[in-house]
C-alpha cells in the first residue's frame, strides 16, 4: 500500500442536532474534520499508510482534533502545536426544502499562521509516495499559501507524486487571487482534480488533464 501525505486545516465542526435551525438550538454536536483530513481518513480505511500534516493550538481542543484523526489510524506525528486557535465552522443541517447553512470562524487559526519553521518537510516526505492538498489551504492566508509551496518543493525534492483538488471557495478568496496563487502552485502538480468551474481558475489544458486521467 502507498504512503500518502495530506496537508491542510482540521476544523472543529459545531452542528445543530435534529435538523434544528441555529436560532432553535440549545446545544451543538461536535466533530472534527477538513477536506484533506477526510482524504487521509478514507485512505487509512482502505489500508494505506496515510498521514495528515497540520498545525493545531497547544491546548485540549487541539489535542481532541489530533485524537479524532488517530481513531481512524491516521498518522499524526508531524502535526505542529503552534498558533492561537482551531478554526471553527457552524453547520445548520437542512431539512426538506430548507438548505443547510454554514458559518465559518477560522480567522487567525493555527494553520493560517504556521510557517516552514514549524515543520520538518524533509522528514515528512522521506519514503512517501504521494502528497495531496487542496485549494482550500493556500486560500486560508498568505502564510498558508507560502507554507503549501514549501511543502510542494520538498515533496518534489523527494520524488513524491503530487495531486491537488482545486476546490475553489469564494468565501476564502477571490477568483483573481485564486488564479494567481494556484497558477504558481500548479507547476509542482502531477494530477489535478476539479470541476469545470474550478478549472477556469488555473491555466490547465484539457489535454493535460486527460493525460493524467489515463494514469489513474
Q: What positions do the PLM features span?
A:
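Structural motif
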Residues: 5-7, 130-132, 163, 193
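Generic secondary-structure signature for well-ordered alpha-helical cores
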Residues: 12, 16, 70, 74, ...
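Conserved N-terminal subdomain of the carbohydrate kinase-like
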Residues: 49-135
